Amino acid sequence: MKLSSGWEQSVYVLLILARLPENRTMSSIALANRLKVSPSYLKKIIKSLVDEGLLRSTPGKNGGFSLNKELHDISFYDVFLAIEGRGRIFQSQGLLQNFIGSESGKAKRCAITSALDEIENTLVRTLSNVSLAQVADETQYNYNLGYLDEWIDEMD
């Protein structure tokens, strides 16, 4: 499995916006410049985060984006759903019957499908158990975020 680059970009967008003073917003251009990523791709990502209710969009000359939820209420899985979409990670094509050449057998489900369903369930649980607040706290503990905060202040 591979997460798109949009997932990681989304996490950092959310972490940056969480550091904004209350009632402040930031433009997608400023975020793209800070992360050194494609502005057009980041706009699509941000739209997905807004559509999923993780970000709030404020229109107007001084508009931009801000968090719509607290970091402790946003999990890695919430970001995953916003960026990668809803639905199954693995969808069986039903190839077992073609493989064995008949529809008869002892098992009701394909062993491959069963294993991948269990893997998906574990992944969903794991992603759901990691909040962005945990990530923010760990990042704050391990790194000096002074340069980031100075940059945010300069955006005023």
UniProtKB/Swiss-Prot annotation:
InterPro entries in the record, alphabetically? TR_Rrf2-type_CS, Tscrpt_reg_Rrf2, WH-like_DNA-bd_sf, WH_DNA-bd_sf
Q: What is this protein called?
A: Putative HTH-type transcriptional regulator YffB
Name of the coding gene? yffB
Q: Which domain of life is it from?
A: Bacteria
* HTH rrf2-type domain sequence ranges: 2-137
Classification via Pfam families: Rrf2
Q: Which Gene3D superfamilies match?
A: Winged helix-like DNA-binding domain superfamily/Winged helix DNA-binding domain (1.10.10.10)
Record's Gene Ontology CC terms?
cytosol
Q: Which GO terms describe its molecular function?
A: DNA binding; DNA-binding transcription factor activity
Which UniProt keyword terms apply here?
Answer: DNA-binding
